[in-house]
Amino acid sequence: QANKLVNSCSLCGLCQEVCPSDFAMQDLCRQARQDMVARGKMPPSAHEFALLDQDFSLSADFALARPQAGQASSAEVFFPGCQLCASAPAQAQAVYRRLMATRPGGVGLLLGCCGAPSLWAGDDARLAGAHDQWRGAWESLGRPRVIAACSTCLKTFAEHLPEVEAVSLWQVLDPAGLGRPAPGLTLALHDPCTARHAPQVRQAVRELLAGLGVAVEELRLGGERTECCGFGGLMANANPELAREVVRRRGELSGRDYLAYCAMCRDSLAGVGKRSLHLLDLLFPGLAGEDPAGRPRPGWSRRRENRSRLRRELLRDLWGEEEAAVPGQAEIKLIMDESVAARLEERRILAEDLRAAIARAEAAGDHLVHPETGHRLASHRPHQATFWVEYSPGPEGFVVHNAYSHRMTVVGGGRL
């Protein structure tokens, strides 16, 4: 229970903001996590999924550093962050093209992760590695000024990479000619907790909305006293039930559609059924469909696929670099109903792990068969968790009936 308490904190700083004695509960919880990691006492189940997602964002599947196409160097570089690209890749691409067209001196592109997951997890070694990689990519571009779309990235840079000159996208984006919101539109504005002490960012967002003619309903808890969406501090990984309650309660502060300018805030709200838009949905209408406030939260597998596809498309369309297909199990088509898909999402089981299990089982005949249903059961252990998938071959692909994972190791039990 002590572990769960320490790992359930969103590290958002609201406790300190309202405390008459200025007690920083978030610092205490993060220091406790650092101590647990250093002593080998942090349970892998608490943060492993988020840390592996960070690894993915720093891998060749997503990471990229380029000056603006056709230029040897650029005065600025756009860093959209990992979650905007995972949630809304079309909007990320559109805003980058806008920056290239309107910013003097050229705007390069840097894809990757700021290291926030390892920071929140208390994994200092992993954080240092992420920052070394990010710093190396940034320095390879000539140390340009960073235009960041994510307030968490900005906060991370300010506190841990002070040599980086960074500014919010919302402070530099030219809105002229962008957006056609309906007349009289009023939205409830959700400030991300990482913008709590960034008044210049919050003000820039409100000025953009005023320029678009969008009226803002200020939530009872906003600005310096805004609440976390449940994703911060990896709360949703360590204590998903609490995270759902936090974001559900946040969504009940107003009956209006919400507007967020953090991708994870928007997706967290959408995940509990709260109609929510991202600011880029207003600035680049049509990219999220006819009802952007009703856009569902992309699942974990889709988030990775979106990042990889965005990287490939940008390399092809802007730099003329066509990447060869990465060998793997992408050709294995998975078929499942909505209830199974929801179960996999809740259990944080990725499609790529199911494909890997099925590919190995089909190639080696290394699977079990249920005597009554004929369903096959196969496993895959890429890291510390073993993934099991119950499936059956079909004419159009492999039908997934169920999947689960565990962290047990059966001594002498072979690969299964």
PLM-predicted stretches and their roles:
Residues 1, 12, 28-31, 37-41, ...:
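Iron-sulfur (Fe-S) cluster-binding modules
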Residues 1-161, 298-315:
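Iron-sulfur-cluster electron-transfer modules
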Residues 126-131, 240-246:
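Nucleotide-sugar donor phosphate/pyrophosphate-binding loop at the beta->alpha transition
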Residues 189:
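Hydrophobic alpha-helical positions that pack around
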Residues 228-232:
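Active-site rim beta-loop-alpha module in soluble metabolic enzymes
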Residues 233-241:
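Acyltransferase/transacylase module recognition
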Residues 292-416:
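Ribonuclease/tRNase effector modules and their secretory precursors
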